[in-house]
């Protein structure tokens, strides 16, 4: 109910990591939810499904199946190495597609999930000191966070049953200005340096599959080491 909702005013320039850390400081629950303001619910029981996984002892971060406004897949887990950093699994696939080895329709583990819709225990959040607001203000903070949580000995889960629309970048716009592009490149470089080994060999993704496209296709001979 609205009586249980508290609206906080963040008194500083946009910094996705800092804003979410600020919100968590005021939260009282044992499970934290990061939900972007451009998210729209499709599955009525989405939260029940995601909390069911988040409260398991073996689970760290839990992400959802996110769709573009035209119902194409926007997010069905995160694969390390796409674009040199990380990208969304099965991006632009039809909503009805099962995906590679049913990984769109089946709940399964990924190294990371997007924080556009992410649940995690408060204890895990505190254990890794939240999101990195100094080095990752906008991009890749969720990937960095998921990998830190994974380091606690738990698995990050993509919850296929929870479907939501993600009207991506409607509120902020795209990072197309020179300043935003420079910031993105700095954050990409930080991720590549901090998680070099994981990006080179994502344990949730086959080394025989390409990192050139987000579609789980087999590597071309020119991509083989």
Where are these regions (language model features)?
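Acidic donor-binding segment of Leloir-type glycosyltransferases
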Residues: 1-13
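Catalytic metal- and UDP-sugar-binding loop of GT-A-like glycosyltransferases, i.e.
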Residues: 10, 35-37
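Glycine-rich, basic loop-to-helix element that forms the pyrophosphate-binding segment
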Residues: 10-27
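Short aromatic/hydrophobic "clamp" motif used to bind/position activated sugar donors
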Residues: 32
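Conserved donor NDP-sugar-binding/catalytic core segment of glycosyltransferases
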Residues: 39-84
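A short, conserved alpha-helix in the catalytic core of glycosyltransferases
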Residues: 46-50, 104-129, 134-165
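Short glycine/serine/threonine-enriched helix-capping/active-site loop
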Residues: 62-65, 159-160, 167
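C-terminal, non-catalytic tails of nucleotide-sugar-dependent glycosyltransferases
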Residues: 70, 82-110, 119, 156, ...
